[in-house]
Amino acid sequence: MDVVFALGHFCEAEGPSIIFCTQKLHRSTVSKFFEHPTSKRSIGVTENGNDSPEAFKNELDNRNNADSQSLQSSTESLFKADSEDYLCKKVSKGPESPRVNSFHNSYSRNQSPISRKSSCVTCSTVLPLEFSVPDVQPRLYTNSSTNPDVLYMSSQHPHTQQRYSTLKRLMVRCLSCEYSTLSEASDSMSNPLFFGDQDNGYVISQSFSLRDPSARGGLRRYAIIATCPNQLDLILRYSFISEKFLHIVQFLRISSFNTKNDYSSSRSKTTASSSNGTFASPSFNISSLSGSSNIGTAPSYEISSSIGANVSSLAHTQRLPSFSFLRRRDDIGEGRSLVDITCWDGIFVGLHSSFSWILEVWDLLVV
């Protein structure tokens, strides 16, 4: 079974990007990550600094028992999104996402794609302090309850270059050219979509939008996908997967809606201006161009026959207005991660437990 669950979004700076993915791996495969220098201080490394494969396996067992209750509660919170009382108890204000360096400065051929760093806040995976290690890419592990040699790992990117490239292409299609009709539940969510081919695999996709005042149009577009090279495996589980995707999306939408007003009231936005041009505010209109400092008085473009001037001479003498408000925003990098949008610092822990649970019962879903 080569199934990957992933969450992506359309980044204003990088385009369609992968934020989070969960995959089923064997322990022998996971131990290879510690061959890379950037992976030695992982969440699976033992407290005494011993990073051998045997010590790593023992530490995984110990930490899995300690974190099982928190992961289980996170799974229930995503699959019970219609309970507003539960949200009021579980959703807490998370810290603003820290800035991260671009992966172009730290990536090398010897590193796995899992060690890449996102270049913006909106594409980053932010974990609670108890699940994170400083200077190490966020990763989560869950042991399989049926097979001791299998575990489920979540990270921002898959662990192999081939799987990363394939997942990247599928995410680009989900957020650019593959569209479905709008869902009856909400205008900001489409119906589940199934597509794929033999080369890149097959996908069940659920695209949706979340309220984010810092995004263009006040909405940020996301997509949850389940990809598998076997078309029949996804078709047999289409109803179950699409139902669980709907529950996750409902939870995320309720969380972002409840925190939208709090964010709008705490952050005051002003009209950005620079010497190179004028940038528009939401109340900006075309008539205000005449009062702009870099335009002066609005010129007249009417041609009078009594003057005797031709169009070519006026084109050189008259100064056209600078429609610089149509230019790209300078604050494009000032986005918010999914943690800030939902105001829940454990949102990626909940996604990990939800995707891991689906992978755990994958073989039991065939009717």
UniProtKB/Swiss-Prot annotation:
Region named Disordered: 41-75, 92-115
Keyword Zinc-finger: no
Pfam families given in the database record: Folliculin
Main location: nucleus
Molecular function GO labels: GTPase activator activity
GO terms, biological process: Golgi to plasma membrane protein transport; negative regulation of TORC1 signaling; positive regulation of TORC1 signaling
uDENN FLCN/SMCR8-type domain sequence ranges: 131-302
Feature: compositional bias, Basic and acidic residues: 54-64
Gene Ontology annotations for the cellular component aspect, listed alphabetically: cytosol; FNIP-folliculin RagC/D GAP; nucleus; vacuolar membrane
UniProt family annotation: Belongs to the folliculin family.
Protein name: Folliculin-like protein bhd1
Lineage, highest ranks first: Eukaryota, Fungi, Dikarya, Ascomycota, Taphrinomycotina
Recorded name of the encoding gene: bhd1
